[in-house]
């Protein structure tokens, strides 16, 4: 069943590659670009087609199979998705291309390119299109369109959807996937129109809207959003990424006119408070660097919204910011957006629960015989869920420190190494304080950071389990 489903997923990627083909046709690009795209499509059709010839008798997917499908799908899609860049000679290194598209599908936005203008329009579009596909999840997308989305596919969706608790918004899983994607695409379309009306060229509007929707961060120009020189666009992008950093289940509540459930959500309130407080502190701390408070606030709001939602759209160099402001951004890198959103990171809900666990622990010392319960949104969080979150945090911290230790062999700059690892593992994007690329790192570090991006997007376990002997043993 694993081989059969992976083959179908490779065929889906082949179909998706027809989108950049149409862009190449529109812009009348070189034959080399068409050869690169069709060669990749041919490889995917050959591999995918050979794998679906024999349909498995047992189509049930268990937890182990679900995890393997998710992990292998993301790795394979990233590998094959990078081939057009290699074949076209625009990113000659296979490792660099794998890094670039891993960054795309995981909506990280980290790049090895020093100059994005080397990319043709079609591959520039494909690069950002991977943000749109990966934003809600490659498998959620596949589940929304596949004809055999049975309840057993719950294990696939649970392994991919970010957050400590997975919940279906409606009874049928396929309907859940379709509703989530319809909401997602509706908001994406809205921002394409908004950006176009704000003065962006149509091509740019699509590229930036895809980066906004997926909270990715790939742009059309080397200087990122600063290229447009518009405060209106800066604010619109900031608001846009914050919109996509919210749990999509809450938007479904709004559709059902459950306004109280939307605004009463504890994670949403904590998310907005963190954004406002961080923006306020940085605005005041960097006030002396800008002509007035309005510009200081604009820059602070842009950076905070982009970092907490793990988007990473570039806007100039902030290395001249005070260390206090840079450490706030580093702190936000660890938090991330909401569970069930397109944002990466540890997630606000986990931070909220961890803070409540710490509070209860302190209270239990003061009152040893007092029975303490933990509530989020008036729902009791049982001990099992609390322990799972604590275990996740421990594993997350151990991997993060290990990555920093290994990648530090490439650089003596603590802030660069730390922020690079935070950026990749939390799917944020650029190295803190600069819009420069990840080309400074060695091939080994790039491979490591590529897997860190995929692991971070899938919340660690699926990639971690690939390296366990028991995962590959027969049932």
Give the ranges of each region predicted by the language model.
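Membrane-proximal intracellular helices of multi-pass ion channels
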Residues: 1-475
């Amino acid at each position: 069943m694993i081989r059969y489903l992976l083959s179908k997923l490779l065929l889906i990627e082949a179909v998706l590659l027809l989108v950049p083909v149409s862009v190449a046709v529109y812009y009348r690009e070189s034959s080399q670009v068409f050869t690169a795209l069709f060669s990749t499509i041919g490889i995917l059709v050959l591999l995918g087609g050979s794998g679906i010839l024999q349909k498995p008798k047992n189509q049930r997917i268990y937890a182990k199979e679900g995890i393997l499908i998710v992990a292998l799908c993301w790795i394979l899609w990233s590998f094959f998705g990078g081939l057009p860049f290699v074949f076209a000679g625009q990113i000659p290194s296979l490792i660099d291309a794998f890094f670039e598209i891993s960054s795309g599908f995981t909506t990280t936005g980290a790049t090895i390119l020093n100059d994005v203008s080397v990319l043709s329009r079609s591959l520039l579009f494909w690069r950002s299109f991977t943000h749109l596909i990966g934003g809600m999840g490659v498998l959620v997308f596949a589940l929304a369109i596949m004809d055999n989305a049975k309840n057993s596919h719950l294990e696939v969706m649970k392994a991919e959807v970010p957050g400590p608790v997975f919940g279906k918004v409606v009874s049928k899983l396929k309907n859940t996937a379709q509703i989530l994607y319809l909401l997602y695409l509706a908001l994406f379309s809205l921002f394409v129109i908004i950006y176009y009306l704000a003065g962006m060229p149509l091509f740019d509007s699509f590229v930036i809207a895809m980066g906004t929707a997926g909270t990715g961060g790939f742009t059309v120009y080397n200087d990122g959003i600063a290229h447009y020189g518009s405060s209106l666009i800066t604010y619109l992008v900031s608001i846009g990424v914050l919109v996509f950093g919210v749990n999509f289940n809450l938007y479904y509540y709004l559709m059902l006119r459950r306004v109280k459930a939307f605004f009463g959500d504890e994670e949403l309130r904590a998310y907005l408070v963190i954004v406002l407080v961080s923006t306020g502190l940085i605005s005041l701390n960097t006030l002396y660097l800008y002509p007035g408070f309005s510009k200081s606030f604009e820059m602070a709001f842009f950076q905070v919204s982009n970092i907490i939602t793990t988007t990473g759209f570039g806007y100039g160099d902030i290395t001249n910011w005070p260390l206090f402001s840079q450490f706030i951004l580093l702190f936000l890198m660890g938090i991330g957006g909401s569970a069930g959103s397109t944002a990466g990171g540890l997630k606000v809900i986990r931070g909220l629960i961890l803070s409540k666990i710490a509070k209860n622990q302190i209270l239990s010392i003061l009152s040893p015989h007092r029975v303490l319960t933990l509530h989020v949104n008036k729902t009791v969080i049982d001990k099992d869920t609390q322990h799972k979150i604590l275990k996740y945090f421990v594993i997350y911290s151990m991997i993060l420190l290990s990555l920093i230790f290994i990648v530090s062999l490439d650089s003596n700059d603590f802030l660069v190494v730390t922020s690079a690892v935070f950026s990749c593992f939390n799917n944020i994007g650029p190295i803190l304080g600069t819009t420069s690329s990840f080309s400074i790192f060695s091939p080994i570090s790039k491979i490591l950071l590529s897997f860190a991006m995929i692991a971070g997007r899938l919340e660690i376990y699926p990639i971690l389990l690939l390296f366990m002997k028991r995962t590959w043993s027969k049932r």
